[in-house]
Amino acid sequence: MDEFQREGNKHRFWQQCFLYQIFFGEDLNAMVHDHHLDRSSSFERTEILISNYFSFLTVKRLIRRIRQQNDSTGLFGNCDPNQFIDRNRNSYSESVLEALTVILEVSFAMRSKHFLEGINGWKSIRSIHCIFPLMEDKFPYSNYISDIRVPYSIHPELLVRTFRRWIRDTPSLHLLRFILHSWKNSFSAENLQKAMVAPRENMRLSLFLWNSYVYECESFLVPLLKRFSHSQSLLYGSFPNXNHFVRKIKHIVIFPXINISTXRIWLLKDPFIQYVRYGERSLIALKGTHLQVKKCRYHLFHFWQYYFHLWSQPYRICILELSKNYSFFLGYFLSFKMKPLVVRTKMLNDLFITNLITNELNPIAPIRSILFFLAKERFCDISGQTISKLSWTSLSDDDILDRFDRICRNLFHYYSGSINPDGLYYIKYILLLPCAKTLACKHKSTIRVVREESGSELFTKSFSKEREFISSSFSKTRSQRERFWNSDIIQINPLSNSWQKIQNKQVEN
């Protein structure tokens, strides 16, 4: 990948205009073939499902066959489109998809680099671990928050139109359109969600298309927010020349001319805008009146429709008042509460006492959602009654304890910044009893017998590291009034996605 990027910097214009020629390079096909062999060998233990004889001439003939196809069902033979996420399909079609993904990734990397260099004054932090500290420091200064959901279902022509803005190679666009229409079911919400949760699935092209689509949205949205943040409060009636003012507004807001009306227009007064995103969720913190925030929501709706030709449902952009509502983001219920603060100031012989009111972030762990997830995984039922894991009885005692220990430790590590640790201790109690019942079922005895035979060190050895971490993190939180964020996104990602999916269904209903 680095080698292709270095070559692309020398011949950037050539790559954008003649990307299709790179398909016939043997270096690219060899790299894709080796990558496919390595991935298949890691997933398939018994045999490798790829032919030992790989011919570059066959790949070229396959590309020529694709160009001559008229029926979209014959792209990769008479195969089922649902086999896009199946590892048992033809190796040559796999190589074509991998080669197309590599070429698009290289061209996309060069374009995104130039875009980030062109944005001055807008600080961008790409680490997922910086989201919660940023929200804790910056969001309390805002009074409204806009919760945006990026649509998962993407039409193939919308993706092709996006790539046409920075790729001028017609054969590559035709090949991309052919693949997208042949496998359009693979870019649905379920398959994209599966690709984000389970990276083992072969969904590299789907993830790249999703990331490029989100990047295209942000490439227009971030400059728009930047212009809003640097603008001043202006009133239409204060300008003697109304046409001159409308031209200024048209320059500030980058929407088409039909969106600008001659009515009174207010921009944000002392704007304070913060933008964070993870997955399909985006949060925009705003400071202003309710009317001003509604105007921003109106602009976002038109931004989505005119630039991406996509009808955005009203429930996908929600405006919440921070002092009265909460938002569900990354597995947390986020709310802000007013906190009184007394400040004493001494000047010469006078002592002044000032009462200040500040907003404080209160992240709450969704105990009911965690309980629902444990019930779904058959650790307990909906009411909280514990159930033994019969499928784990074939494991050793150490493996059983280690699995329960890992689940409990991951939950406490991720929700170390929450303000309701008592609910997490209840989740720990629910996990302890299934662990004991599983061991008792394995040894065909009761919990008391297992405890007596194994001794008191059976459960004290388990969850020991978790107990030390809990005591240290919560004591630090209460003493120094600082939260300890340990966002292990990789391990908690399936939990966050499942809870977010439940929350989305509640919002839609």
Curated annotation (Swiss-Prot):
Cellular compartments annotated: Plastid, Chloroplast
GO biological process, one term: tRNA processing
Pfam families from the UniProt entry: Intron_maturas2, MatK_N
Molecular-function annotations in GO: RNA binding
SS bonds (residue pairs): none
Source superkingdom: Eukaryota
Recorded GO CC terms: chloroplast
Chief subcellular location: plastid
Keywords assigned: Chloroplast, mRNA processing, Plastid, RNA-binding, tRNA processing
HAMAP family: MatK
Function: Usually encoded in the trnK tRNA gene intron. Probably assists in splicing its own and other chloroplast group II introns.
Family of the protein in this entry: Belongs to the intron maturase 2 family. MatK subfamily.
Protein name: Maturase K
This protein's encoding gene: matK
